[in-house]
Amino acid sequence: MISLRLYAKQGFHSDLKEAYLRVNKLILVLSFVLLSSNGLAVQKVIYPSMENIRETRFQDLFEILEQALDITRPDFGDYELSPTPFPMTESRMLQEVKSGKIIDVIWSSTSPKKEEELRPIRIPLRKGILGYRISFIHKEHQIIFDQVNTVDDLKKFHVGQGIGWGDIDVYKHNNIPVSYAPYTTLFSLIGPRRFNLFPRGVNEIYKEYAVHGESNPTLTIEDGIVLYYPWPYYFFTSKENEKLAIRLEAGLARMIKDGSFEAIFNKYNADAIRKAELGKRRLITLENPFIPAETPLNRSELWFKPALDSLN
């Protein structure tokens, strides 16, 4: 009797141990399956925070970035998107993304130097609309700009730009004088003491006026001229972060195919395009020799094309 009880007790513990091992094995298998289905570990993606907390001029690019990462979850896994803990100038951002230590991705205009030092994702994020420029001017100077019709006319004026902006080289190449200062101070410097006009992308100027107009009562939007020079804006990663670059390329391609890329463009730009009335403005084209040969200018679906025939 005692031996039977002992056997039963031992058998019970043996069965319990076997069940425990089976459960552990099942947990390991499930963990492996879950890891496999999620791709790999969570991909951390750090982008630069804005110079001014009130700024919304890059909200569309953030939305594109987030959507490109979302749409590629099935193939590349989950991600964690976060800004840097402190703002940076464009020059600093370029340095940091190159090193890959603080920033993983930036958005910026392109140039041969940037494409040599960084890894470009060659899809123009705003369809090149930044190449169409309307200017902030002093409110008393519209009568002066009514007489401006050519690049030679522009050479009489100083253009304002942010520190480290690639546009500086474009204006210098066209022999237009340039002054530069931190972005947040540019709106208060327009006038005879510093510079005469501050060209902004069609998609930027109305939003910026809503933010900075009230605190700068002499600021106004010039109403007769549109400048143009090819100016694509890309995502850039470090050359070593090929995994993120490939993921962003895949995500943007899918967004173009499913229409979400165009939807974001229209969401953020349609109102500004309507307000700008580009067909009623005098078109002044500037040379931009700093566009890399690899720029996909032949892919018409990637570019914003206003009714240029209606421009004077």
Task: For each feature predicted by the language model, list its residue ranges.
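Short helices/loops that flank or line small-molecule/ion binding pockets
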Residues: 84-103, 173-174, 184-203
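N-terminal signal peptide c-region/cleavage motif recognized by signal peptidases
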Residues: 36-37
